[in-house]
Amino acid sequence: MKYKDIYTEAPANPDTLSMLGPIAPLAGKWFGDDGVDTHPQAGGPETEPYVETWDFEVMDPQNNGPQVLYGLRYHVHITKPGELAAFHDQVGYLLYEPETHKIYMTLAIPRGQIAMAEGTAMPGDREIRLHAERGQMVNGICSNPFLEEAFLTKSWNVVFKFHEDGRFSYEQVTKLEIPGVKGEFEHTDANTMRMIEAPRPNPAMIEEGLLNRCPKA
């Protein structure tokens, strides 16, 4: 990344949706009821079905001085079939930097854990791979003391795949170090999602459109 100084903000396109590159297909609200989750239990691995929604909200461009990021604010809500109470809730941002084609996915869950996965993809790619690893300064993982002791997260990998029919699927593998369990335990999640609500434009784009239709005298 080339820049004259670290303070001067680069110009940003208010139309975030047109600048999202490879993550653009994710914008909108999605539903999936084919989820399969394999997680650790005292008696060994347990596999259960789940139902979920992913809500990717188009947000305004973000400047770090000369760096410009375009992204989606997301919320994941997961329940077991036939239940209302969530057994997994997740929020974060999915960010794309057009200049470097880098993608950053942040994660925060109410179990007391945060992470940021990183990857690279080009506009039009049918697959996105992201990786986070404990101890890394950029794509790292940070957990509360209990999780560090009992379910140490070593790495988090997520793959998004975009299908011709407009759906997307994902696979996640979270590698854990658990006392009494030999080797690393692979906690896996996978589902296929279909859109239930189209994306809405970001506030800056709405404002830009209003100004164009009603220019100031």
Each language-model region and where it sits:
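A short, structured loop/turn motif at beta-sheet edges
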Residues: 64-65, 96-101, 119-129, 160-168, ...
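Aromatic- and glycine-enriched beta-alpha-beta binding-site module
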Residues: 70-114
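Amphipathic/hydrophobic helical signal segments and adjacent flexible N-terminal regions
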Residues: 1-71, 77-81, 152-155, 175-217
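Short, surface-exposed charged micro-motifs
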Residues: 53-55, 93, 118, 157-159
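Exposed beta-sheet edge/beta-hairpin loop segments within beta-rich domains
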Residues: 21-22, 146-164
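Short, surface-exposed beta-strand/loop "edge" segments at domain boundaries and coil↔beta transitions
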Residues: 80-87, 112-117, 137-141, 178-183
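An exposed acidic His-Trp-rich patch
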Residues: 98-148
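Internal, hydrophobic beta-strand segments that form the core of beta-sheet-rich folds
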Residues: 166-176
